[in-house]
Regions:
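Generic detector of well-ordered alpha-helical packing
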Residues: 54, 87, 123-126, 217
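Charged/polar low-complexity intrinsically disordered segments
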Residues: 157-159, 175-177
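Serine residues within intrinsically disordered or low-complexity segments
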Residues: 161-163
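Domain-scale recognition of functional cores that engage charged ligands
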Residues: 113, 133-158, 182-202
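Rossmann-like AdoMet
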Residues: 1-116, 132, 276-285, 290, ...
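A mobile, often basic/glycine-rich helix-loop segment
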Residues: 117-156, 225-238
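Glycine-biased, low-complexity coil/linker segments
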Residues: 166-169
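Long, Lys/Arg- and hydrophobic-enriched amphipathic alpha-helices
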Residues: 177, 182-337
């Protein structure tokens, strides 16, 4: 998954294959910018402050966010510097056209050691996963070999991988190993890269004022099952066919991600459905405001875009919002019970 996605983002325009929320409606980025501004105030207005985005795509979300911040929160705009976590030179070039003031980083660890507000939309789903299969109480780990899935018993995979699966999908001591053997085959996914990111970010947010907002897709609670998928030309595709020509993603384990951040010292809020989060932040009020000044067809398109982001049978329920923050920060906007 890591190599295939690296090749994909280096050679292809991913937005030819799928459309993300910032490309659907400008209101998405605007209200995320306002979320950051209000959260900055809740953190007692630290100066200077980093406004960072992990996996910023074309830079559309940040451009929309900065426009809204400049119009409504000039003191926050003056205090912030923009930082992108991006490993694709192709995407970095597109981001530079949208947000020329940005600074680029290969990882979270290379961000300046300053108070940080981090945004990540559809970032975690692209991080690599490991898959484990359990049959009759025995674990195997799934690999890709010669464009096919193959399995090796846990403990023998060290010949081809530096990261053995002896821990099992529980991540330490084999949490799932203590369960009774299932009556049928079960598949579990382990997201070590996401857990590492959560731990590093959680420690950063615990050490100084800061917050992070993640919008991505996956269940609220940890679950079993195969969530690996490939998207090519806007359609699902075989994840093993033509590596490097499709976007590979997997559902986010929000519960495990939040637990890793809390273990590092951060507070967490959510996850909650994206539709509820965006509605609380004024998605439809802002959309109606924009639609009033448009021709009827354009107004309908704006309203449909908002519905696409928030309706339960579209993106509103599968996609979730999760916030991490400094333990002393009050509840961030949108997460009030």
């Amino acid at each position: 998954m890591t190599r295939a996605n690296a090749a994909y983002y280096a050679r292809h325009d991913p937005f030819a294959d799928f459309t993300t929320a910032p490309e659907i409606s400008q209101v998405f980025g605007e209200i995320i910018g306002l979320w950051a501004a209000v959260t900055w105030k809740l953190l007692a207005r630290p100066r200077p402050v980093l406004l960072a985005e992990a996996g910023p795509g074309r830079g559309t979300l940040m451009a929309d966010a900065l426009r809204a911040i400049g119009q409504t929160a000039p003191s926050f705009r003056a205090a912030l510097s923009v930082h992108f976590i991006e490993t694709s030179p192709r995407l970095a070039a597109a981001q530079a056209a949208s947000v020329p003031e940005a600074n680029w980083h290969d990882s979270l660890e290379t961000l300046p050691n300053e108070p940080t507000l981090l945004i990540a939309n559809e970032f975690l789903d692209a991080l690599p996963i490991r898959q484990f299969v359990r049959r009759a109480g025995e674990w195997t780990e799934r690999y890709v070999q010669n464009d096919r899935f193959t399995e090796l018993p846990c403990g023998r995979e060290a010949r081809i991988s530096p990261s053995p699966c002896g821990r099992g999908p529980g991540g330490g001591g084999g949490r799932a190993e203590t369960r009774p053997p299932p009556a049928r085959e079960e598949l579990f996914e382990l997201r070590e890269s996401a857990q590492t990111f959560a731990g590093s970010l959680g420690a950063r947010l615990a050490a100084q004022p800061g917050a992070a907002l993640f919008l991505d897709y996956g269940p609220t609670e940890s679950s079993s099952g195969d969530s690996l998928q490939a998207i090519r030309d806007g359609r699902t595709a075989d994840p093993l066919a033509e590596p490097g020509t499709a976007d590979l993603t997997a559902h986010v384990d929000f519960a495990a991600f939040a637990a890793a951040a809390r273990a590092a010292g951060a507070a967490t809020h959510g996850p909650i459905p994206q539709g509820i989060f965006l509605t609380r932040l004024g998605l439809f009020q802002r959309t109606d405001q924009l639609a009033r000044n448009q021709h009827p067809a354009e107004a309908l398109a704006l309203i449909d875009a908002a519905n696409r982001l928030a309706e339960p049978n579209r993106m509103g329920w599968l996609f979730k919002a999760l916030a991490l923050c400094h333990p002393a920060c009050p509840t961030p906007p949108g997460f009030e019970s």
